[in-house]
């Protein structure tokens, strides 16, 4: 990865009940020299995620919410604390994140070839139908700052919102070969996994309505 001027990259890891994998993800990120800082945001986890993160307290920036505020709020909090020129988002449920994956994700934007990069898991020749909802992303921090309030309120619809914000800009999709993240069924009980899938689907639909049909969203959304 070559850049004409020295730049810094902050990596933000939103964490919600990822005790099985978060230690490995953080350890790998700390071992990769291109990151200026690792920011972990515990989003009100009810498992042992916070305990795992506290093991790295001297080496990471740790933000912890007492209640689950949603992925959008977690990312917004990380962006506010970030010192880097660029911010990378990495999910906490990855099992085999490597420096090769990180280099593939960062290269297009550090080379000046993109305004944003989305890295999607690719296995064999099978298409990834959810590629545009990937959590592995890189942006110029300054381009996100005007949208912090929207990001904070988007919950699990944050990827949909970011896609809309960067519509019409140069967004590069890069395959992250054989990258694996645990499914909810692998992390939760079957009942809880189904519940979380439904909640996340609702949040995505809610975000789409908010962006594309605000009048309808105002009618359907519960009042405060």
Features from the language model and the residues they span:
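Conserved donor-nucleotide/metal-binding helix-loop-beta segment in metal-dependent transferases, i.e.
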Residues: 99-120
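Conserved donor nucleotide-binding strand/loop of the catalytic core
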Residues: 36, 50-81
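A conserved acidic beta->alpha catalytic loop
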Residues: 42-50
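Hydrophobic helical membrane-anchoring modules
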Residues: 1-2, 164-224
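Short aromatic/hydrophobic "clamp" motif used to bind/position activated sugar donors
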Residues: 87
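Short beta-strand-to-loop element that shapes/binds the nucleotide-sugar donor at the catalytic cleft/hinge
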Residues: 117-129
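Short, well-formed alpha-helical segments that are part of the catalytic scaffolds
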Residues: 17-31
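Cell-envelope/extracellular polymer assembly enzymes that use nucleotide-activated donors
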Residues: 8-10, 37, 161
């Amino acid at each position: 990865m070559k850049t004409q001027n020295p730049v810094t990259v902050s990596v933000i890891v939103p964490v919600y009940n990822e005790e099985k994998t978060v230690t490995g993800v953080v350890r790998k990120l700390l071992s990769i020299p291109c990151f200026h800082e690792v920011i972990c945001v515990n989003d009100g986890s009810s498992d042992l995620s916070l305990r795992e993160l506290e093991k790295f307290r001297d080496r990471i920036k740790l933000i912890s919410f007492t209640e689950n505020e949603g992925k959008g709020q977690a990312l917004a909090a990380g962006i506010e604390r970030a010192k880097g020129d660029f911010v990378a988002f990495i999910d906490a449920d990855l099992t085999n994140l490597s420096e090769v994956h990180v280099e593939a994700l960062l290269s297009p934007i550090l080379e000046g070839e993109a305004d944003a990069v989305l890295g999607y898991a690719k296995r064999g020749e099978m298409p990834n139908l959810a590629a545009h909802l990937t959590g592995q992303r890189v942006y110029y921090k300054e381009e996100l700052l005007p949208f912090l309030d929207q990001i904070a309120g988007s919950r699990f619809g944050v990827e949909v919102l970011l896609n809309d914000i960067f519509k019409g800009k140069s967004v590069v999709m890069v395959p992250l070969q054989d990258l694996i993240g645990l499914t909810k069924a692998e992390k939760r009980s079957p009942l809880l996994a189904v519940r979380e899938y439904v909640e996340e689907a609702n949040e995505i639909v809610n975000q789409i309505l908010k962006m594309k049909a605000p009048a309808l969203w105002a009618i359907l959304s519960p009042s405060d």
